[in-house]
Amino acid sequence: MEVMPQPLTIVILAAGLGTRMKSRHAKVLHQAGGKTLLQHVIDTALELAPAERIFVVVGHQAEKVRQSVTTPGIGFIEQTEQKGTGHAVLIGRHALAGLDGHLMVLYGDCPLLRTETLRRLIAQAAEGPAAGVLLSAMMDDPYGYGRVIRDSRGHVLDVVEQKSGTPEQLAIKEANMGIYCFRAGLFWEHVGEIEPNNPAGEYYLTDMPAILHRAGHTVEAMRIDDPAEALGINDRAQLAEVDRIFRDRKRRAVMAAGVTLIQPETITIDPAAEIGQDSIIESFAQILGKTKIGENCRVGSCSIVSDSTLADEVHIGAFTIVTTSVLEHGVHAGPYARLRMENHVEAGAHIGNFVELKKTRMGKGAKANHLAYLGDSEIGARVNIGAGTITCNYDGFKKHRTGIGEGAFVGSNSTLVAPIDIGEGAYVAAGSVITNPVPPDALALGRARQEIKEEWAKKRRKLAKT
């Protein structure tokens, strides 16, 4: 049975710029798997400790990093000079030293760490006498990683960095992953002994195992099977690889829950998205943000559904974009439709090809099957919107509302100049420009009367020849 130390304090190191990213943005602000690298690590930490026991060390672009964190209650410690990982923790001593229990150190650019792995690390730290436990992995090529030096009993004596190791030490395949869980009291007692004895003049947290060993304490290492789990991101290629891993994890979880993905490797599903059983997501679709999709739905190829809610049996045709909208049971949208923002489409309604909705409510069974723009509108149940209909909702200064009552029929190529209301059961003749309210059950015609001029074309052609 796992033993979880209580309480646990977590420090996340996120002060670096990440020069190899070749970016104007701090490294931890880059996104993989639908969230910033830092937010991934924070979300993992929240599975282990309350927000008030989680602290982020910030440095480069400190204010932007603070603002990027979506979790209330997280503490921040500013490292104005980046002098190494040991220094990053040491400057938080006044804020953290009074917190007993265990202290875990994580990195803001290591988003792939699983909660289960960290629980095992914490349990090992709690069960035994060790002053600290570090995470390690066996690697075929550990170049660039610190090597874990053990004694005959398997205890950690030291972590030797690539630049300072002897050939014998560098031949060791066990690499330090840089994740630690210390007994807080012993850590704060000895962390001040770290010295900048390296060409960079920095204070390295990797010195702590040797310091604790010299003080007569035991340090252990817990090996993980997959080194990629603790992969830190240093450049764009690694960022892309981590994003791929996140996407693959999510796709596998979705399929395990009963969702069919057609060509799954082409599909993007964000971590917070939810998809119901027996739904089908076609190739190259993107399910983004906090989208919730019900059961027996289908999302067509190359469609994008973002921060929206789809009830059961909703069908999204290919190349359709749905943003911050609600689609009730049995709605059909697309192909090539756009539900731009804040729309609510009631049960059984149809939004056809090349139809755009913006801040519009469509009633039950309403239909706009072809080539229409409906903005800032309230459309009643069973309304039929003909092809080419547009609501003229903007007068150059303000947006205006269009209301269409239940059972109304709007003919093709109609222009509805808002603000305007069309009553229940009313008809709008095709080609009309409607500028005044239409009473219920009335017929509105707003077009020029057709005129026929016999033989006009024949005379025009004859004239052109002269």
Swiss-Prot record:
Gene3D superfamilies: Hexapeptide repeat proteins (2.160.10.10), Spore Coat Polysaccharide Biosynthesis Protein SpsA, Chain A (3.90.550.10). Residues 1-236 are annotated as: Pyrophosphorylase. The active site is at H370 (proton acceptor). Residues 237-257 are annotated as: Linker. Pathway: Nucleotide-sugar biosynthesis; UDP-N-acetyl-alpha-D-glucosamine biosynthesis; N-acetyl-alpha-D-glucosamine 1-phosphate from alpha-D-glucosamine 6-phosphate (route II): step 2/2; Nucleotide-sugar biosynthesis; UDP-N-acetyl-alpha-D-glucosamine biosynthesis; UDP-N-acetyl-alpha-D-glucosamine from N-acetyl-alpha-D-glucosamine 1-phosphate: step 1/1; Bacterial outer membrane biogenesis; LPS lipid A biosynthesis. The keyword Nucleotide-binding does not apply. One of its GO terms (biological process) is peptidoglycan biosynthetic process. Mg(2+) binds at D109, N234. Binds 1 Mg(2+) ion per subunit. GO terms for cellular component: cytoplasm; membrane. UDP-N-acetyl-alpha-D-glucosamine binds at residues 13-16, 27, 79, 84-85, 107-109, 146, 161, 176, 234, 340, 358, 373, 384. Its EC number is 2.7.7.23, 2.3.1.157. Keywords: Acyltransferase, Cell shape, Cell wall biogenesis/degradation, Cytoplasm, Magnesium, Metal-binding, Multifunctional enzyme, Nucleotidyltransferase, Peptidoglycan synthesis, Repeat, Transferase. Residues 258-466 are annotated as: N-acetyltransferase. In the N-terminal section; belongs to the N-acetylglucosamine-1-phosphate uridyltransferase family. In the C-terminal section; belongs to the transferase hexapeptide repeat family. Catalyzes the last two sequential reactions in the de novo biosynthetic pathway for UDP-N-acetylglucosamine (UDP-GlcNAc). The C-terminal domain catalyzes the transfer of acetyl group from acetyl coenzyme A to glucosamine-1-phosphate (GlcN-1-P) to produce N-acetylglucosamine-1-phosphate (GlcNAc-1-P), which is converted into UDP-GlcNAc by the transfer of uridine 5-monophosphate (from uridine 5-triphosphate), a reaction catalyzed by the N-terminal domain. This is Bifunctional protein GlmU. The gene is glmU.
